[in-house]
Swiss-Prot record:
GO cellular component terms, A-Z: cytosol
MF terms (GO), sorted A to Z: ribosomal large subunit binding
Keywords, ordered alphabetically: Cytoplasm, Protein biosynthesis
Protein name (Swiss-Prot/TrEMBL): Ribosome-recycling factor
NCBIfam families reported for this sequence: frr
Designated gene of the protein: frr
Protein task: Responsible for the release of ribosomes from messenger RNA at the termination of protein biosynthesis. May increase the efficiency of translation by recycling ribosomes from one round of translation to another.
GO biological process: cytoplasmic translational termination
Family label: Belongs to the RRF family.
Superkingdom of the organism of origin: Bacteria
Keyword presence, DNA repair: no
Location of this chain's protein in the cell: Cytoplasm
Length: 186
């Protein structure tokens, strides 16, 4: 394995960590409605559990309401039940074959709790990125030990890995700040 392979691999893994972090952030409910909030809701579709997006059309009715339109009329009750039981604190209301999911306004206390959750998720993501840096540095040390690269090359590559780490940690910080601002906006 070459130095370039190590750097390329660690950058890809760090990018995947950022993507996973973004997905985690998308699941955290803010006062504003977005269809991504229901992405992980599973619906019982003729005996098998499937994502809600495979049995219904999700749209934004307004800034605080998600519209869920099941493709089959007989699925309306099951979809509503799945949303209610998804532990998101949502209370869907059915009007014909359209399910409206209003976003309740967040209390100040709940907003503060959510910002703590966001910070915690951010720290977890940073730890993942730093662990990737550690793994890359260990691989570089192994190359030096096996006399495949010089110590100078290892130091340069280590600096490059540190720059990648700093870049990704800064991106995580930026995502945390924007999510906190979104949560605290009334």
């Amino acid at each position: 394995m070459s130095v370039a392979d190590i750097k390329k691999g660690v950058e890809q893994k760090m990018q995947r960590s950022i993507e996973a972090f973004k997905n985690d952030l998308a699941k955290i409910r803010t006062g504003r409605a977005h269809t991504g909030l229901l992405d992980h809701v599973q619906v019982d579709y003729y005996g098998s559990m499937v994502p809600i997006s495979q049995v219904a059309n999700l749209t934004l009715v307004d800034a605080r309401t998600i519209g869920v339109q099941p493709w089959e009329k007989n699925m309306v009750a099951k979809v509503e039940k799945a949303i209610r039981e998804a532990d998101l604190g949502l209370n869907p209301a059915t009007a014909g074959d359209l399910i409206r999911v209003p976003m309740p306004a967040l209390t100040e206390e709940r907003r503060r709790e959510l910002t703590k959750v966001v910070k915690g998720e951010g720290e977890t993501a940073k730890v993942a990125v730093r662990n990737l840096r550690r793994d890359a540095n260990e691989q570089l040390k192994k190359l030096v030990k096996d006399k495949e690269i010089s110590e100078d090359d290892e130091r340069r590559a280590g600096d490059d890995v540190q720059k990648l780490t700093d870049k990704h940690v800064a991106e995580i910080d930026k995502l945390v700040q924007s999510k906190e601002a979104e949560i605290m906006t009334v």
